[in-house]
Amino acid sequence: MSKKSIGKIVRIIGPVVDVKFSEGELPDIYDALVVNNPQTGKKLILEVEQLIGDNTVRTVAMDSTDGLIRGMEVENTGEPIKAPVGRGILGRMINVIGEPIDENGELKDVEYWPIHRPAPSMAEQKTEIEILETGLKVIDLLAPFPKGGKIGFFGGAGVGKTVLVMEMIRNIAIEHKGFSMFAGVGERTREGNDLYLEMQEAGVLNNTVLVFGQMNEPPGARFRVALTALTVAEYFRDVEGRDVLLFIDNIFRFVQAGSEVSALLGRMPSAVGYQPTLATDMGELQERITSTKRGSITSVQAIYVPADDITDPAPATTFTHLDATIVLSRQLAALGLYPAVDPLDSTSKILDPNIVGKEHYEVARGVQEVLQRYKDLQDIIAILGMEELSEEDKLIVQRARKIQRFLTQPTHVAERFTGMPGVYVPIKETIRGFKEILEGRYDDLPEAAFYMVGTIDEAVEKAKKLTQAVVI
């Protein structure tokens, strides 16, 4: 920690501000400097990024620099930007420097932690792999989440990403007694506002912290907001020993903001114009997301793929850190099959018989095999019709359609729209249900019985009701 000192602004180029200090009073890299902005009447935070010689530092502003002029006094706080942490922040919405932005008054019962922190050491980390049960059949069966892992969410607008995110927040809060952090990184302000209001209505806000650095904010704020949310999550993991869910929407915007900051600082660009420190920036964030012996941080990261190019350095660098990928399909959403998770494209590194167990692995692969065969047969069905298929293929198609429908389930957060009560399905029940479908135990039940139910017993019950309705 450097000592407090006063400097003066010597140059301003957009969000980059150069500040000169007296001999021997230079701040450290990542120290927070404070300047009073007369235009806004607020304190503006500058983060030191470079020492450029002649007792001058180059800083990046966390808010607009409009109103700053050369010669203004800048105070060195002698420490990095700090984020508020603790129980008092639950249910609140804050910005990158920890200021509340939800108009609900000042934060109470909080302490402050620096946003730049080392990742947990190998000795502190938990090496055993554990599944984080989400209660969502399609995810738990085909792309299970590892506790303390990183999961990538791929999906466009309107495929049910927000509902899925909110359902996970609800399940972590209710079923696992855990907390969720949501980092809005460089996305639309309207979407952040909608999410806040929807969470309020769904009753999950009190177990959540929202941290926003949106599209309209300077690159410095967008680049650091994920670290603020992560610091809040680390408190609940390390001090309270909880399982925490950290949502980052969108991880691509984090890279994009880093690229802007890098260019403003005058660094030579790397491949496709990205910052030369891309892998380091990503690693510093991702390595802090892990399980320790006290608790875990499991991260779900929405990933925008520019021009659908998977080889772009931004998504490519993110992939190296991911343990599972969840692909949301527009085709499934159009058919009303929610959650619209693609069962063939979604993957998880822990779908391994040595980790999830032989039965889970074999059932998951059996489900994918049947669905893949159905996909292969769809062209033949479209041209010649079902009648031209062999008896074996007809049976596969029938089972595949039942599996497709059984992968759906009603969610708690969408209950008021669908009128169907939400369900949380334990992994054991999920495996049992799909295993029995694959074994052919329910070949005589109608397809409709498997749509939007929880366990296989509910499907059997629904089939009885459907049969009675037909008889009546």
Swiss-Prot record:
Segments crossing the lipid bilayer: none
Superkingdom, natural source: Bacteria
Cross-referenced InterPro entries: AAA+_ATPase, ATP-synt_VA_C, ATP_synth_F1_bsu, ATPase_a/bsu_AS, ATPase_alpha/beta_chains, ATPase_F1/V1/A1_a/bsu_N, ATPase_F1/V1/A1_a/bsu_N_sf, ATPase_F1/V1/A1_a/bsu_nucl-bd
Residues the entry annotates as binding ATP: 155-162
Catalysed conversion reaction: ATP + H2O + 4 H(+)(in) = ADP + phosphate + 5 H(+)(out)
Family statement: Belongs to the ATPase alpha/beta chains family.
Protein name per UniProt: ATP synthase subunit beta
GN (gene name): atpD
